[in-house]
Amino acid sequence: LVPGKPNLPSKIFAIAIPPGAKATQVSFDLGEGIALPGTYRIPPASLPRVIGQENPLVYQREKQTYEDNYASVYGSDEAYPASVGEFVRSAGFRKYNLVDVRVTPFVYHPQSGRLIYYPDVRVNIAYSFPKGFSVGDIMVDNLPRKERVAQEIILNYQQAQSWYPVGTVGGKESYDFVIIALPLMDIPLAPLVNWETLKGRSVNVVTTTWISANYTGYDLAEKIRNFLRDKYPSEQWGIEDVLLVGDYDDVPMRRCWQDAGYGQPETDYYYAELSLPDASSWDSNGNHQWGEDSDPIDFYAEVNVGRIPYSATSTVQHICEKSAAYEANGDPAYKKHMLLLGAFFWSDTDNAVLMEAKINQPWMSGWTFTRMYEQGYSTYPSDYNLRFTNVRSVWSAGQYAFVNWAGHGSQYGSYIMYTTGEAFVSTSTCPYLNDDYPAIVFADACSNSDTDYPNIGRAMMQQGAVGFLGATKVAYGSGGWDNPSDGSSQSLDYYFTTRVTSLSYTQGAAHQWALRYMYSHGLWYLVKYEMFEWGALWGNPDLGMATVQTYVCGDANDDQLIDVADAIFLLNYLYKSGPAPDPLEAGDANNDGLVDVADAIYLLNYLYKEGPAPGC
């Protein structure tokens, strides 16, 4: 989004070059342009505005930039953009070495209204290898889930396969889920560690003390990032998900040197984007001002990152317990029920539009929605008027697996626009919520996760939420939003929500997918600032809305032991009309797809004849 300039579709493509290579030149060959018949009036990209308390001086400065942009383009008939293709940055995703290019296939002449379409664009990348590079320097990293992400990202993914070692070479140890926490957290974390292990994840809890003693860095944050950079490839641990556990100062977030006039955001995206060491990316000039405009950071996260933003052991244990319970709960009255809280941003921006767009998905045909909009102002029907007391009473009495609100925000709540302008949700809502039915929450508002304050996102994680995605500083919205291509916070909201509710993505994977999509499709106003402020997810990154059935093969009676009682249980089920294993698959000890007498025999051989262990 370039406010004031023609709103033309464009996309950033990631193109792989051989590992170790450095791009020396990028050029573009265009096929013949097609002049579309007629004349066109392409509107300018609108100016996003903050969805909180606006600083009038900052707004006037941004408005002046918008007007200058408009005059510079619409005041002449010069082609816009000047080039169909543009080099954006060097980048990386895990083992892959990438070059980002932006392609805008339409060229607009504002005064005459001519529009030229270029259907064929060839990208040429020249590269060279640095002195001393050898094939031994190539990272070994072959993880099926991450390869599927790479295939989504990389334009020439198939071509790149011949450049890397094949197979599933792994390190001496394998931990695809890493928890970074303060010492003495084993007991509070046990409910989540046990649950993730049952799901098939290989979990390792690593303390900040151990990292600090074994890795170098300017501060603890850099040491943690260096640890993750070292261990994430599959030739080491094969890390895919990272959960940070601790207050912002105990397990530090990274303060970023981006400021839209409302303060610098802290982010956990620093721990997700691991392509290069700090000295070559986040702090390239070594001035310890991370994330400056000059710092060459890319926007493809190597790992999914979430955080439990508490150090208190009792709170951590409670969040771990409800995280496991959330995924185990299969009641559709809960897991397919959404609460939609849509206020106006401005008079032309009713967030009921956003709410209705998000739930218009084929997989939601059997879901239940409870709507609260600004009645008397919104043209959309709702079940309740959007007011504080209504939200508190309805939410606390209901069962909602996903809650979405959109409205002007602060560190402590979100607000309606009309009548009183009151908060419809705030930190004082949380004590009333039923934590037996916590929700994944997307907060489309300013500052709801602002780490300089005791924010509502953190309060929700203590009571009411099992995941929370909000902005760590003042956020931007798009006026008149009615389509995901309009960008800003509403589009991030749309993409995160639709990914999570599809049941195909965990909240951590949905978070990174949505951030990546926003970047590659040019939907941000201030790319670094907004990627950073939306780069902190509260909660377990491996948590999803799909119900997870966990069981141990052979534990037919579900007593957490494999013994002769399981063989007897199976025989009673098969021949005495006894109860069935729950789930039935738990009785399939020999993993042949059937539950029959062979499974009871298999168990007896394992227990008394040194036969192979049950396994799924």
Regions found by a protein language model. Give the residues of each.
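Cellulosome-associated attachment modules in secreted, modular CAZymes
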Residues: V548-C616
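Cysteine-dependent hydrolase recognition
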Residues: L1-V548
